[in-house]
Amino acid sequence: MNHERERRVRIRYLRVGAAVLLLVLMVAGVVFAAYGCGNSGDEDNVTADAEVTIPPTEALTELTESEVQEPVVPFVVYPHRSESSAELDKKYSGKNGVLINAETGEIVAGRNEDKQCYPASLTKVMTLIVAVENIKDLSDTVEITYDMLAPMIAVDASLAGFAEGEKPTLEQLLYGMVLESGAEAALAAACYVAGSETSFVEMMNEKAEQMGLTKTHFTNVVGLHDKNHYSTAAEMAAILSYAMQNDTCRKLLSAVEYKVPPTKKNPEGLTFASTLFGRMYGDEMPGVKVLGGKTGYTDEADNCIETFAEVNGTTYILVLCGCNTRWDAIYDTLSVYSVCCAGGKDYEPPEK
C-alpha cells in the first residue's frame, strides 16, 4: 500500500515537472521568436514598417511639425549700419533710400531707411517670392477672368495684356507681373496658389514674419495704395536679397524681354519689356553692371526703384523710394552705384 502511494506521488511530481518544463520551453520559444524577429532583416525595413504602423506620439508629432515649419529662408540679409556707413547725399532723389552690400548686409549709405514708406509695385517682389515657392509646375495654366481684370482696370493699374478667357502659363504670368508690372498677372498667380488674393496676402505677411521683417505689411498683391500697405527701404532691400537667392526669382528679375506666343485672344502674341531695362542698359557707368530689379509708382509712393548690381566683384542692392520722376530714379541709381561703390562720378544724361 505504501509502495502504491509512493508510486502515485512520483507520477504526480513527474506530471507537474513535465508541465513546468513545457511552460518554460514555451516561454523560451516566445522570447526567441521575438528576438529573432527583432534582428532579422536590416534596420531600415524595421524603421519603415514602424513609420507605417505605429501611430505618432506627441513627441513624434512635434518633430514632424518642426520639420514642416522649418524656415525655407536659407539666409536673410538684414541691412545694418556700421561705423563706415554714410548718409545718402542730398543731391540724390528719394525720400527713403538704402545702399547695402548684398553679401554682408552692411549699409554703405542710407537715408530714412528704417522709416515707413509705401512700396508701390516693389510689392511684387514679395508676390514673386511667395508664388515661386508655392508653385510646383510653371507650365500649369490659369484662366484669366473678368474678376481679375475689371478691378485692375477700374483703378488704372498696369496690365500685362492678357485677355479675358485666355489661359496663360504660370511662367508667362510671372514674367508679365515682373517685366510689365502686370496687375492681372499678379492676381491670377495669387488665385492659383491660394484660391484668393486675401489668402495669398496672408501668405505674404507670414513670409515677412518668417524673414524677421517687423515694419512690413501687405494688403494686396499688386502694390495698390493702402495706408496699411507699407514697408521700409531697408526691409525692401532684405526682400530683394532673399529673392536673389532663388534661381527662378533672380532669372525673372534679371530679364530684359519675354515673348508670349499668339493666341486667339492675342493673335499677335505679347511681348513683355522690362520697365527697368527699358530705361537703362545697366552698364552706363564704368565698373558698374546693374543686373536686375523692379520699378514702381503710385501717386502716394511717387517713383520707386530697387536694383542689384555688381561692382568690382561685389554685389550691392540699392532701394530708392519717393523719387520725383522715373528718370530721377534711374539716373540716381546709376550715380549712387558709381560714386559710392566704384569711386566714380555721377551719371550725366545725354543731351536731348
Where do the PLM segments sit?
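Gram-positive cell-envelope targeting signals
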Residues: 1-58, 236, 321
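Active-site-adjacent loops and short helices of periplasmic peptidoglycan-processing enzymes
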Residues: 55, 59-234, 243-244, 311
